[in-house]
Amino acid sequence: ADSIEPYVIFFHSTTRDEKHWPEREWRNLIEKLTALSVQVRLPWGNEKEKARAKRLAKGLSHVVVLPKLSLNELADQIANAKAVVSVDTGLAHLTAALDKPNITLYGATDPTLIGCYGQNQHYLTADAMEKITSGQVFSTLNLLIK
């Protein structure tokens, strides 16, 4: 997986269900990236997240479900990525600390209170996660990876 460039990372999992973005939107976003020749890498931290990553990647050749990674290994993946898309998770803050372009998706959580800071940090927000569309995310991501 390390030899293919460029790539983006999707942090698709978080601890609270209301902070998850619908899998259909992740799939739609992944499919939109096909035309850009950008690989999508999906990390995971537990078996539930691994199962989600496999569902998101199913049947798509430009998607890699990463092996279980340490935090240092994950930081290396972030450091070499073109951009990151994440739900509200601590890994979004790690991305900000590494100054990588990041789009964080927020539902009921107010990003002005707990959001990531830095010039490369972007966020999309709605009163519910399912109201954020893959089209909105793709429009922003497309600008970041050009």
Where would I find each of the regions flagged by the language model?
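Mid-sequence helix-capping/hinge segment at a functional interface
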Residues: 1-19, 23
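Short hydrophobic-acidic sequence motifs that mark active-site Asp/Glu residues
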Residues: 7-9, 41, 123
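Short glycine-centered, acidic/aromatic-flanked micro-motifs in structured strand/loop junctions
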Residues: 12, 42-44, 126
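Tryptophan-centered motif/residue detector
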Residues: 16, 21, 26, 44, ...
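Short, flexible loop segments at the rims of nucleotide/cofactor-binding pockets, characterized by
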Residues: 17-19, 61-65, 126
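Donor-binding and catalytic core of enzymes assembling or modifying cell-surface/extracellular glycoconjugates
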Residues: 23-111
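Nucleotide-sugar donor-binding patch of glycosyltransferase catalytic domains
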Residues: 55, 65, 93-146
